[in-house]
Amino acid sequence: MVTIEDVRAIVAGLDRAYEAVVRDRVKFRVGRIVFLAFSRDERMMGFAFPKDERAALVASEPDKFLLPKPGDMRYQWVVVRLDAVDLQELRELVEEAWAMVVPKRLSAAYFATVNPDGSGNPDGSGARDAPGAPPTR
């Protein structure tokens, strides 16, 4: 199972990202924008995700992904159960959430560095269409 420590290690390599504790919950931000937030027990992680694609994501893997609580439905947000993802998928979720809140040039430069062939995927699969695109499932 992945943990918050795995997320911290991933976030450490992302420009402008930092950790904050708000109301006893760990959150990761760029500026004032939250792109990751943990439940108090750190077993679930909310992450930035395109609002118009989240229903399909949750429907595709309902044991892994959840819609946000009703009060947060207005945000571009999805929740993942950490015990249901591996480290590679966690990395993709974290990187893509971060890419949603930073300037496109910054995310493009990061993904070009992660995979110099320009695909944006560390595995070189080329499945990533463009910087800031949601993770391929």
Residues covered by each model-derived region:
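Charge-dense, helix-prone N-terminal extensions
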Residues: 1-137
